[in-house]
Amino acid sequence: MRIAVICFCLLGIASALPVKPTSSGSSEEKQLNNKYPDAVATWLKPDPSQKQTFLAPQNSVSSEETDDNKQNTLPSKSNEDPEQTDDLDDDDDNSQDVNSNDSDDAETTDDPDHSDESHHSDESHQVHFPTDIPTIAVFTPFIPTESANDGRGDRCGLRTEVKIIEVPPINVQSPDATEEDFTSHIESERCMSTKKTSRLTDHSKETNRCELSKELMPKAKDKNKHSNLIESQENSKLSQEFHSLEDKLDLDHKSEEDKHLKIRISHELDSASSEVN
């Protein structure tokens, strides 16, 4: 049980790591090896003591892989050239021969005097697992295509930025302008000038009104004062005349009373004298 658990652990580790395929693989695997040679740096090297337990599942995996490769290559034979199909068939036959030789070598691993060549063949066969090779994106550096301006002193490598001065657009009147446009422009200018003059006149009128109002205010105050003086004088005159009339009436009334008294006295004297006689 322990050996089986160890085998499953090793299989999981081996399937997780990118592995270089053997030379007996299909043409697609060879093309992948040629495109990505850096993925070969991480090879799996298990212990030689566990080869017997490890090679039994490998043979079954390799046979399944060859069957899958055959199935993948069969539908594409109609589109490929006959020379390419012959090459693929030769590669498959070679892979089957190599797998049979590897199985024979695996049976002879029980001998103590096993050569180093069998060890290397076992390792090469052991590495044969269908793993997804990681794709490495190749970034090409940016190379400027502009010509070098040596005469001016600029260098394209330094990527000097040239400041662009933006010139404001100038409205140039074309000589083909019609008279109507010209007259409309003149009329608009006249309207603007009349508006400005009307504003100026309105402002001047307002200022004149303010000045006149300021000048008329003290004059009105003086007139009010003069009218008040005249009214006071007239009132005083009227009061004096009224008092004088009252005095005259009093005098007249007194004179009339005196006359009546005198008449009475005279009548009494006359009556008294007649009685005496």
Swiss-Prot record:
Glycosylation site residues: 101
Q: Where in the cell is it found?
A: Secreted
Where in the body, by tissue, does this protein show up?
A: Kidney, liver and heart. Weak in bone.
Its cellular-component GO annotations read: extracellular space
Which InterPro entries does the UniProt record give? Osteopontin (IPR002038), Osteopontin_CS (IPR019841)
SMART domains, per the entry? OSTEO
Recite the UniProt keywords alphabetically.
Answer: Cell adhesion, Glycoprotein, Phosphoprotein, Secreted, Sialic acid, Signal
Tell me, what's a Pfam family for it?
Answer: Osteopontin
**UniProt GO BP:** cell adhesion; osteoblast differentiation; positive regulation of bone resorption
- The answer to whether the entry has keyword Phosphoprotein is yes
Residue ranges annotated as motif Cell attachment site: 152-154
Per the record, residues carrying Phosphoserine are 23-24, 26-27, 60, 62-63, 76, 78, 95, 100, 103, 115, 121, 124, 184, 188, 204, 232, 239, 244, 255, 266, 271, 273
Extent of Polar residues compositional bias: 49-63, 227-242
Any one GO molecular-function label of the UniProt entry: extracellular matrix binding
Which interval of the chain is the signal sequence? Answer: 1-16
What segment(s) does the record annotate as region Disordered?
Answer: 38-129, 184-277
Report the sequence similarity comment from the record.
Belongs to the osteopontin family.
Sum up the protein's function in the record's words: Probably involved in cell adhesion.
What protein name does the entry list?
Osteopontin-K
